[in-house]
Design a protein with these regions (language model features):
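Beta-strand-rich assembly/attachment modules of structural machines
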Residues: 2-253
Length: 253
């Protein structure tokens, strides 16, 4: 009898989580083609934890943010997914966590672009982000401050505020040649500041920057500055295959 009760409780909890995710949506959202020659090329979570804005961004790049994957983990779909930019201005009724906003962004593009994707998991070379033998050197973020600004690149590294280790690992994946999996078991949110040489990494640099060659490698920087380490390993990597996508009508809100 106790087993039956426990199973029922687990099923009820799973159902509640799935329902909560299914009902996460922005209160107001505008999705439209970007103006020809428009400037921007950026998608970001706005201060206040209620709003996502994209300016002049193709669907493929929007997907990397919504699903927390790198560009190399997305395949398929029509050619315009890579080449035609869109503007998005989406606002939630109340402040949300970053994870919830990402789910809301997923639901938005799945609805507006009639997006259908298939997940494909492959066992590939990865880096595991682990705590180095000397222990972590990461400032814990003030739990009373709920703002989640996105991590940003700087001329000689990157900075992030209120960052989980899982999201930090994803950010590292975007600039390295393989996916990074969080194995730190560090549960808090942290303020991260990392200085390293960008030269030879996958960070976009429109104009040659002499500072890109300055500083330690990212592997050395992680050890010396944060007490973390990238350990080569093999692990599961999630790939998204676009099976269907349609352009949204103009001025859809």
């Amino acid at each position: 009898m106790e087993t039956v009760r426990l199973s029922a409780a687990v099923l009820a909890l799973c159902g509640a989580v799935m329902y909560a995710q299914a009902t996460l949506s922005f209160d107001v959202a505008i999705v439209k083609p970007a103006q020809p020659g428009g400037r921007g090329g950026i998608i970001r979570q706005m201060p206040g934890n209620q709003r996502y804005v994209a300016n002049n961004v193709p669907l493929r790049l929007i997907m990397t943010v919504a699903y927390s994957v790198t560009d190399r983990q997305i395949s398929g779909g029509p050619s315009w997914v890579d080449s035609e930019p869109f503007d998005i201005d989406a606002k939630a009724a109340n402040p949300r966590t970053s994870d919830e906003l990402h789910v809301m962004l997923q639901h938005l593009i799945e609805e507006r672009f009639q997006l259908k994707i298939r997940h494909d998991t492959k066992e590939l070379p990865v880096y595991e982000l682990v705590v180095d033998k000397g222990g972590p050197r990461l400032p814990v973020h003030d739990p009373a401050d709920l703002d989640h600004p996105p991590m940003g690149g700087s001329p000689g590294g990157m900075k992030g505020t209120n960052v989980t280790m899982n999201y930090f690992a994803f950010t590292l994946s975007r600039i390295l040649d393989r996916s990074v999996i969080d194995k730190t078991a560090l549960p808090a949110r942290y303020d991260v500041s990392l200085e390293f040489a960008r030269e030879g990494l996958g960070m976009k640099q429109g104009v040659a920057d002499p500072s890109a060659a300055e500083g330690p490698s990212i592997f050395t920087a992680l050890k010396e500055q944060l007490g973390l380490k990238l350990a080569p390993a093999k692990g599961p990597v999630d790939f998204l295959v676009i099976e269907h996508a349609e352009k949204p009508p103009d001025n859809q809100d």
